[in-house]
């Protein structure tokens, strides 16, 4: 059995302020830091061979904090794929104590366009709660100058299929720390959800969701905490 662990980053400073964040690179709040550490406690005894995050700092912070108390005692190290010489380790002994971490913008949050930096309640008052709900949760409706969930899936799913899924097929246990909508697009594919079903899919911050890869299919595990 091979595991795929999905984790939406801990609360960010802008989550705390109820602002649309998208691609704006905002760090975790104090609560988000604690959520990441708590998530780490939940998954500390699960095997992890490789980590993937987005290029946004809240995703990276969450992964690193979650791994601080992992039972393997292994240290995540960032692989700079554009400059592999930067992260080459020349000691086999040290390499055995490390877990590779890869970053990709394909896993970034959906880009919220003209909503980024705006207060969610104020936007709802301006455009109506139903319109904002469709922007945030529907599959193909995008906010002004932003991405829909469909647009987000056009980058997350090819990256998963090309870069991550082959590792799972090799028996590697994968930990992905990413964002609400990049993970929603992935879960929609893993669970074969319809466009209607994905409307109600909500992912809380800092709650691990675990899938088992067995018999050539993904099944949500009882180990999930979301």
From Swiss-Prot:
Disulfide links within the chain: none
UniProt keywords, alphabetically: Gluconeogenesis, Glycolysis, Isomerase
Entry keyword Isomerase: yes
GO MF entries: phosphoglycerate mutase activity
Source organism superkingdom: Bacteria
Annotated SUPFAM superfamilies: Phosphoglycerate mutase-like (SSF53254)
Entries under InterPro entries matching the protein: His_Pase_superF_clade-1, His_PPase_superfam, PG/BPGM_mutase_AS, Phosphogly_mut1
Keyword Isomerase: yes
Feature type site, description Transition state stabilizer: 179
Active site: 9, 109
GO biological process: gluconeogenesis; glycolytic process
Annotated substrate binding sites: 8-15, 21-22, 58, 109-112, 120, 136-137, 180-181
Family stated for the protein in its record: Belongs to the phosphoglycerate mutase family. BPG-dependent PGAM subfamily.
Role according to the record: Catalyzes the interconversion of 2-phosphoglycerate and 3-phosphoglycerate.
Protein name, per record: 2,3-bisphosphoglycerate-dependent phosphoglycerate mutase
Species in which this protein is naturally found: Chlamydia muridarum (strain MoPn / Nigg)
